Amino acid sequence: MENTATAPNAKLEVKNLNFYYGKFHAIRNVNMSIRENKVTAFIGPSGCGKSTLLRTFNRMFELYPGQRAEGEILLDGENLLTSKTDISLIRAKVGMVFQKPTPFPMSIYDNIAFGVRLFERLSKGEMDERVEWALSKAALWNEVKDKLHQSGNSLSGGQQQRLCIARGVAIKPEVLLLDEPCSALDPISTAKIEELIAELKHEYTVVIVTHNMQQAARCSDYTAYMYLGELMEYGATDQIFVKPARKETEDYITGRFG
């Protein structure tokens, strides 16, 4: 297992992280560094804690009562888990795209502009440029440029997910979290999302949770295997899939477990 606790070029550093649903200890003493401008994938069986861990990175768990995190999550050295940290700024810096496409009930244009308006005051011309820029980043602009004022819900499932990614990058975050972004999509849409992830890492630090191990192998630079709330192994994706250090990791990857 690679020692990533003090990795160079770390964008996020997780130190002694524990997470609780009420009294249930869901994540146990996780320590890891997530490198800047790389794609890090979390794999593991259902209920292992990978999506829970992802939601600690932008404190999304605080939307639900009885959940708490202990330890440190450092973004460029700043602990995101302290009460002094502005949660709206955290979510501007650490964007999130969910498993099911969740376009807002408004136009394609306003889906992109909505978050930008919360943090910036742009002129109409500047906002038009930002909307085009974000949709282009999500490889969606050419498909929707003539129907920006139609509902986001009028798009196909794959287009809706790319709209959600565009919405996430529009506020120019530093980290983009993707929680099973392709699980509800067909193979063609999935391939487009995977191509997009490869492009996004040049400007963002990308963290993805996936049940699809082939997707993790294709898309990620680093892979973390979780089991029962513990980080079992974490290292370069090629190493994890070709020569894992732990038998538990090998058993999961080869289908003997999970």
From Swiss-Prot:
SUPFAM superfamilies: P-loop containing nucleoside triphosphate hydrolases. It comes from Bordetella parapertussis (strain 12822 / ATCC BAA-587 / NCTC 13253). This is Phosphate import ATP-binding protein PstB. It holds the Pfam family ABC_tran. GO terms for biological process: phosphate ion transmembrane transport. PANTHER family: ABC TRANSPORTER I FAMILY MEMBER 17, PHOSPHATE IMPORT ATP-BINDING PROTEIN PSTB. GO terms for cellular component: plasma membrane. Disulfide bonds: none annotated. Keywords: ATP-binding, Cell inner membrane, Cell membrane, Membrane, Nucleotide-binding, Phosphate transport, Translocase, Transport. The complex is composed of two ATP-binding proteins (PstB), two transmembrane proteins (PstC and PstA) and a solute-binding protein (PstS). Its EC number is 7.3.2.1. GO terms for molecular function: ATP binding; ATP hydrolysis activity; ATPase-coupled phosphate ion transmembrane transporter activity. PROSITE patterns: ABC_TRANSPORTER_1, ABC_TRANSPORTER_2, PSTB. The lineage of its organism: Bacteria, Pseudomonadati, Pseudomonadota, Betaproteobacteria, Burkholderiales. Residues 12-253 form the ABC transporter domain. Belongs to the ABC transporter superfamily. Phosphate importer (TC 3.A.1.7) family. Part of the ABC transporter complex PstSACB involved in phosphate import. Responsible for energy coupling to the transport system. ATP binds at residues 44-51.
